[in-house]
Amino acid sequence: MDQSVAIQETLVEGEYCVIAVQGVLCKGDSRQSRLLGLVRYRLENDAQEHALFLYTHRRMAITGDDVSLDQIVPLSKDFMLEEVSPDGELYILGSDVTVQLNTAELKLVFQLPFGSHTRTFLQEVARACPGFDPETRDPEFEWLSRHTCAEPDAESPKPREWNSDPGTRSGFAPIGGSRHQSRNARRGLEDVLPRGPGYILLWGGAAEEPEFLLAEEMHEGGPVRGRRPLAGRRDEALEEADWEMSAGGGSRERDCAGVSNVDSSRPNGRGPDQPSGARCPEKPENSLTRQNKSKSDMSEKVRSATVTVSDKAHILSVQKFGLRDTIVRSHLVQKEENYTYIQNFRFFVGTYNVNGQSPKECLRPWLSHSALAPDVYCVGFQELDLSKEAFFFHDTPKEEEWFKAVSESLHPDAKYAKVKFVRLVGIMLLLYVKQEHAAYISEVEAETVGTGIMGRMGNKGGVAIRFQLHNTSICVVNSHLAAHTEEYERRNQDYRDICSRMQFPQVDPSQPPLTINKHDVILWLGDLNYRIEELDVGKVKKLVEEKAFQTLYAHDQLKIQVAARTIFDGFTEGEITFQPTYKYDTGSDDWDTSEKCRAPAWCDRILWKGKNITQLSYQSHMALKTSDHKPVSSVFDIGVRVVNEELYRKTLEEIVRSLDKMENANIPSVTLSKREFCFENVKYMQLQTESFTIHNSQVPCQFEFINKPDEESYCKQWLTARPSKGFLLPDSHVEIELELFVNKSTATKLNSGKDTIEDILVLHLERGKDYFLSVSGNYLPSCFGSPIHTLCYMREPILDLPLKTVSDLTLMSVQTADDRSQLENPMEIPKELWMMVDYLYRNAVQQEDLFQQPGLRPEFDHIRDCLDTGMIDQLCANNHSVAEALLLFLESLPEPVICYSAYHSCLECSGNYAASKQIILTLPSFHKNVFNYLMAFLQELLKNSANNHLDENILASIFGSLLLRNPARHQKLDMAEKKKAQEFIHQFLCGPL
């Protein structure tokens, strides 16, 4: 657990705690707990000096009051840090790291917890060392004089020197400079240092080599980094979490609107003991910087407990598993029951659609209704902000308001740490745990999936947080699915999209990402928007009044869809004993009296999946009247696997000993069920899958698809193998799926013939041979991914043309196309574009939410086929599906409507309509025609805005990033560029063409 925040509170202006680690100071036979903090001081000339601050503490270091400064060790040129390990003792994988700190006057020995957090700490120390150059000025450390250390104990035992006892030996090369050690001497040490078990070399401090060398020598295959954190590793277990401590609302007597008397995480906020002039800690700059930061003024309610390793910078230092590590890890998973036991934790899960409102009432009737304080809070919101600014620019002050309201209303009988929060437009999820459990949370990740049109819009979709609690993996999902009673199939599709696209990176970057279903426990909450069907409004209200919930529940769309196993397969929902939570008149308990008069429905739901889960309550909270929804909560007892550390080490040692006895010289070999794969008639954005099975023989083996010489990936961009690597136990097998999917990135080369559906995959066995797999097939050219000028020269459908003609026209340059137009008679715009626009003009000019709702996935295939075959008369699709197909068509253009060459000019004159029109006139004729045609169509839509609810801002936001794309093809527009692009398009929507 990185307790740098507690250290930061003891520092003065100009000092910043980069990182901290909990350790044990070894003095002879005694062991004393110490908190080590790396502190940086910035001098007036922008130079930096560093020192190690050593603190004693009586309890977990959460605030500055919990620690007492014991000793300061400046990082001068004679500073060195090296690992020492007991000679002759059995090396235990995952054991603590023993390091020795050496200066000219001091020698101290510490034990630090095994894990990547300790590695990160050592690397930060390495970077902070002043270097080996004897001509470099030695730091003066005048700033340290303002600190007073505690008086040392009388007759404290002399620290053991690294060579004073025969029981220790060096395992680390020095971190830091030495007046008597040259660069060559350091390099020479690499050849003479012993290469015993667990040796790691970390070079740091060289002025000429700011990057350190990380090389690891493994013990019979190397250290094991288990799939899950080891209980008791309080520092390591928090390296992935984003904590902030909450007072949980203070005492029972404290009013909900009162101010908590705890430290603030707000930059200009103060805790009760801080003077009014106390400065805020400077923003972290190391690899522990938070990824999803809370806003700077989320104040007065939370206090920091530690900093998160939310980004992936630290992963660069994580060792990669070898074959032996994989075997050990596999055996540990198989024998998990030998060293774990089940312990129940109480989870509060809540969901609230707040309809864009600010918090107006205390949330305790919802969040603190139970007598016992929950161990974990999972709190989800939907429709946090309904403004267009939040919709298009993803920024909202409501985030801070609701975060503060939740923090004030947590159960008053406990203190809580905020682990993580994540937001996608109006969908927000907060995760808190009790302070005493914070040390056992790890591997925290947050991800979002938008299911709005083209996956761009975040008005609908899902957010999720995954984490490890002790030895159990948990995923919490908050989703807001498509609205309207008749749109249940779109809701089903939203659910499937969230499940397929929500992926969490693993600590080991070589491992494939985790999906929602790859967790032991899944909690799914949110406004799922499933309605009550086949009953009119009056009948629904009558059944509610009679409390005939079971009769009403039989008509619930979610129940019907789950029973049909189309969604939430394997999930469970508790019995519903409360009245529908939607739709009410805001500020009351009265059903909707608006013109639409929505029928009551259980839109807000909580489901779960996993073992050892008991639901204790499932209810709505009628006391809250801020929104047109009522909040819903569920309390669970969830059995979590907790590691018995002694049994874990015993199991680990048994596994290592058994592997040591395995002397198998056989080369691993496998048999493949299939080696040749043919994908016929591949179409744009239509997934094709082929599978084969790898059967292993008698030797454990690790397999991986490897890159061919001079290639950056193991396969072409349109192909993916799942999984692309893995481990097989003896006599086991695994099925590999080869997925072929052509998208905007690959379609143009396939249309032109520069690329073909042909590839060779190399399947490599660790310590074994390579197997070659042949992939072949044919691609059906499509208007998607074809240049504008190419399509203008195609008077016939693209699938009716010879492949040679399609290839030649696709490879033709824009300038050549313009020159040829004088001799030939091309169309002014692509016929495919006209087909889609004409369809929308005839059927959808008054369609509500056009270009804002996604279409149905199967209908895109139908639309694409109609365009590519020219059978426009057979086109019959949902208006939203055709609208999305139009956007996908524009997105797939290899050269956007406004050519890349004009991109920067367009941004520069985005406020000058006359200059903007002049730029359009300079475009190639086909591009100019398409632009004018689209603007005329969009202006026609705006004439019907009373019915379709479109306005210039919405259309400019949607089409701005499609018509104006950054020349750096894979670079997304930043916010400033995005606004300028929208402003450029906005001019043409409002002005005459």
From Swiss-Prot:
Membrane topology qualifier: Peripheral membrane protein
UniProt-listed Enzyme Commission number(s): 3.1.3.36
Chain residues that bind Mg(2+): N355, E383
A GO MF label: metal ion binding
Top class in the EC scheme: hydrolase
Modified residues (Cysteine methyl ester): C990
Expression (tissue specificity): Detected in kidney, liver, brain, lung and testis (at protein level). Detected in kidney and liver, and at lower levels in brain, lung and testis.
Binding site for substrate: E383, N459, K460, Y582, K583, K596, C597, R598
5-phosphatase, as annotated region: 342-668
Gene Ontology BP term (one): phosphatidylinositol dephosphorylation
Record's subcellular location: Cytoplasm, Cytosol; Endoplasmic reticulum-Golgi intermediate compartment; Early endosome membrane; Membrane
Region (Disordered): 149-191, 236-304
Modification after translation, per record: Isoprenylation at Cys-990 may be required for localization at the membrane. May be proteolytically cleaved after Lys-320 as inferred from N-terminal protein sequence of the 75 kda form.
Residue span(s) of domain PH: 22-148
Site, as annotated: Arginine finger: Q852
Record's catalysed reaction(s): a 1,2-diacyl-sn-glycero-3-phospho-(1D-myo-inositol-4,5-bisphosphate) + H2O = a 1,2-diacyl-sn-glycero-3-phospho-(1D-myo-inositol 4-phosphate) + phosphate
Region ASH, residue ranges: 669-782
UniProt entry keywords in alphabetical sequence: Cytoplasm, Cytoplasmic vesicle, Endosome, Hydrolase, Lipid metabolism, Lipoprotein, Magnesium, Membrane, Metal-binding, Methylation, Prenylation
Keyword flag Metal-binding: yes
Pfam family membership, one: RhoGAP
Domain writeup: The ASH (ASPM-SPD2-Hydin) and RhoGAP (Rho GTPase activating) domains form a single folding module. The ASH domain has an immunoglobulin-like fold, the Rho-GAP domain lacks the catalytic arginine and is catalytically inactive. The ASH-RhoGAP module regulates the majority of the protein-protein interactions currently described. The ASH domain mediates association with membrane-targeting Rab GTPases.
Function: Hydrolyzes phosphatidylinositol 4,5-bisphosphate (PtIns(4,5)P2) and the signaling molecule phosphatidylinositol 1,4,5-trisphosphate (PtIns(1,4,5)P3), and thereby modulates cellular signaling events.
Quaternary structure and interacting proteins, as annotated: Interacts with APPL1, PHETA1 and PHETA2. Interacts with several Rab GTPases, at least RAB1A, RAB2A, RAB5A, RAB6A, RAB8A, RAB9A and RAB33B; these interactions may play a dual role in targeting INPP5B to the specific membranes and stimulating its phosphatase activity. Interacts preferentially with non-phosphorylated RAB8A; phosphorylation of RAB8A on 'Thr-72' disrupts this interaction. Interacts with INPP5F.
Name of this protein: Type II inositol 1,4,5-trisphosphate 5-phosphatase
Organism, scientific name: Mus musculus (Mouse)
Protein's gene: Inpp5b
